[in-house]
């Protein structure tokens, strides 16, 4: 089977009853299962919103299994009797309409069934009288009424002319000049209407004249389908040459193979024109509404497709292997609604000023679109995008599909690198030795803070200024190797306890402070990937130079900004999620450090920042409000917890 297992919930009693066996064991005979209808239902394709005209003997509009899907009769919709009451007094039209759109009620009673597009809307156009006869005038009037009714999307024609035609003019005269012209007109509308035709029931090698007309008029053939009938019964049953094979009565696709498809049409259980009863009928008249219903599912599922593209998708996705490879019999093969409602080729994102109508629109395969968020805000972005979808497009015909946005997003781990989310915790006033060198080019001093194993190289620029260079090599704040197993989501067991801004990478920066007062200073930093640049101002209101506050601890207030190239908050992205050349984050924070004992230090910090995203041209990331991020750290540090040169 070419069907998926995803639609098993839809394989109900009603679903199987279309095969006429009236029990769930008839699954192998179910015409709906033959065309994989349940797979389309699992993708929410039901025909909802699609409007189908049934040009036939009228419809039993009060039947309990289709009454809710019937559109009020159009004025003049009984063209054979020239009135407004297209009641079915023959039975053919009701049966056809039920195959398309009888309702899915969930009933398990004997006889209950449902149509292919069980939520589609149905118009009754009556062109045949109670004896099954019609006129060219009635046929032409029916199509004229359809042309004037903009809402109609699909026209089902379970009838035809048993004749051959060999040119456009010959076909025009064969099927009726006025009718041909009206058929051509509805095919040339700005939004053309799709016409579905029964191939005929003479067992001929060529289908009806209406099907043959498709060979000679490209406007008509672009939005028309010819349908042959297969049997779902075993060989030996009436009309069957073997399960799934062409029915004995059915005309074949012949020269019209390019516009032809197969569907079940033998022993089909559907609605009767009497009360709310049911009956079995066979014919290409029963196969055509299977296809009309299938087209409704495709049209509903892919709102981006034109009617011609809907027809093309139906034909291109038909099952054409094995028996159905014989195009002169089956045309494109057996209708397959599973294949028709899935991607035919690569799915792609799309961007441009007018999307599908823009000749400069660019398409990117899904694998070329990604967004990897830094650990700093992965939790927030995953939560914000949960349940959100975006449209992508099949490169085959630009059919629109919905995918979860989260499928494109991933999160990086807390890695050992010098990044924006780590700098917020790292930006503290440097340890400064009071030196008396007056010469800007005087001697350099060096100091190691054993609490944090952080080296500082600095030089005096007089009594007034200290210039410095800091190199973090193996400190508590960047001890990636010995602490990597501790400072991560898994070790904590709760991702919200991990400080996203905790610095775990080595780095370097330059700083400037004022010798006479180590309460404040400036600090610059360049990240490890060299594409970021930042500046921070540090202020310490509890400076140890103030005797009254000597034992209050070390409190730093940090104000800073950071610029990132082609990313924000250290994320990385490609394709339609790309960002502009320069995003920046303005941040502020507090960091407090106090020696509790000679060997133990309390460390705490809290930071918040606003990130302004630079937009890239044609990116899906646009018009975003500034992102607010925040974090905190609380911990104890032991003196000489990590030794110098530790690996």
How does the language model describe each region?
Residues 463-466, 508-511, 520, 543-558, ...:
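Repeated loop/turn-to-beta-strand initiation elements of outer-membrane beta-barrel proteins
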Residues 29, 152-156, 223-226, 300-414:
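C-terminal subdomain of the subtilisin-like protease fold in secreted/lumenal serine endopeptidases
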Residues 471-475, 504-506, 516-520, 559-565, ...:
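Transmembrane beta-strands of outer-membrane beta-barrel pores
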Residues 46-48, 91, 103-108, 124-221, ...:
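Substrate-binding/access-modulating region of protease and related hydrolase catalytic domains
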């Amino acid at each position: 089977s070419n069907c998926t297992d995803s639609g098993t919930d839809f394989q109900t009693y009603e679903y199987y009853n279309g095969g006429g066996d009236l029990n769930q064991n008839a699954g192998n005979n179910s015409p709906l299962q033959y065309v994989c209808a349940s797979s389309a239902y699992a993708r929410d394709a039901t025909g909802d919103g699609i409007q189908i005209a049934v040009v036939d003997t009228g419809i039993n509009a009060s039947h309990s299994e289709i009454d809710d899907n019937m559109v009020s009769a159009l004025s003049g919709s009984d063209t054979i009797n020239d009135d407004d009451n297209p009641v079915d007094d023959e039975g053919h039209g009701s049966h056809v309409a039920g195959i398309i759109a009888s309702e899915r009620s969930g009933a398990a009673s004997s006889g209950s069934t449902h149509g292919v597009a069980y939520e589609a809307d149905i118009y009754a156009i009556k062109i045949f009288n109670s004896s099954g006869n019609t006129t060219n005038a009635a046929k032409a009037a029916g199509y004229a009424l359809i042309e004037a009714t903009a809402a109609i999307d699909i026209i089902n024609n379970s009838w035809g002319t048993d004749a051959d035609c060999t040119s456009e003019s010959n076909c025009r005269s064969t099927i009726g000049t006025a009718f041909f012209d009206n058929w051509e007109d509805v095919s040339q509308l700005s939004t053309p209407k799709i016409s579905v035709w029964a191939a005929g029931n003479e067992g001929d090698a060529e289908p009806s004249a209406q099907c043959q007309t498709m060979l000679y008029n490209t406007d008509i053939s672009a939005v028309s389908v010819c349908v042959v009938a297969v049997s779902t019964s075993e060989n030996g049953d009436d009309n069957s040459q073997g399960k799934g094979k062409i029915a004995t009565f059915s005309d074949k696709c012949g020269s019209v193979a390019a516009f032809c498809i197969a569907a079940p049409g033998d022993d089909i259980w559907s609605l009767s024109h009497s009360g709310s009863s049911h009956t079995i009928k066979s014919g290409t008249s029963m196969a055509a509404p299977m296809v009309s219903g299938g087209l409704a599912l495709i049209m509903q599922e892919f709102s981006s497709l034109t009617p011609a593209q809907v027809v093309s998708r139906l034909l291109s996705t038909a099952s054409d292997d094995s028996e159905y490879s014989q195009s002169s019999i089956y045309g494109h093969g057996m209708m397959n609604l599973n294949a028709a409602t899935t991607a035919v080729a690569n799915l792609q994102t799309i961007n441009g000023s007018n999307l599908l109508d823009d000749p400069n629109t660019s398409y990117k395969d899904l694998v070329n679109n990604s967004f990897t968020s830094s650990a700093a805000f992965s939790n927030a972005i995953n939560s914000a995008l949960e349940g959100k979808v975006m449209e992508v497009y099949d490169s085959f015909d630009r059919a629109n599909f919905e995918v979860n946005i989260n499928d494109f997003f991933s999160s990086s781990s807390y890695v050992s690198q010098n990044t924006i989310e780590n700098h917020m915790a790292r930006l503290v006033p440097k340890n400064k030795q009071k030196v008396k060198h007056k010469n800007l080019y005087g001697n350099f001093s060096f100091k190691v803070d054993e609490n944090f194993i952080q080296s500082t190289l600095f030089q005096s620029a007089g009594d007034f200024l200290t210039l410095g260079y800091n190199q973090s090599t193996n400190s508590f704040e960047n001890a990636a190797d010995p602490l990597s197993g501790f400072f991560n989501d898994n070790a904590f067991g709760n991702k919200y306890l991990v400080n996203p801004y905790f610095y775990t990478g080595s780095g370097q920066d330059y700083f400037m402070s004022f010798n006479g007062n180590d309460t404040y200073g400036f600090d610059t930093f360049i990240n490890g990937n060299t594409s970021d640049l930042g500046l921070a101002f540090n202020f310490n209101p509890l400076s140890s130079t103030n005797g009254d506050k000597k034992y209050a601890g070390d409190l730093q207030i940090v104000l800073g900004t950071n610029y990132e190239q082609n990313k924000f908050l250290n994320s990385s992205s490609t394709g339609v999620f790309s960002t502009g050349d320069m995003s920046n984050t303005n941040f502020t924070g507090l960091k407090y450090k106090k020696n509790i004992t000679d060997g133990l230090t309390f460390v705490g910090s809290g930071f918040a920042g606003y990130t302004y995203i630079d937009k890239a041209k044609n990116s899906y990331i646009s018009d975003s409000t500034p992102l607010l991020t925040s974090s905190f750290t609380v911990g104890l540090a032991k003196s000489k917890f990590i030794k110098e040169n530790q690996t």
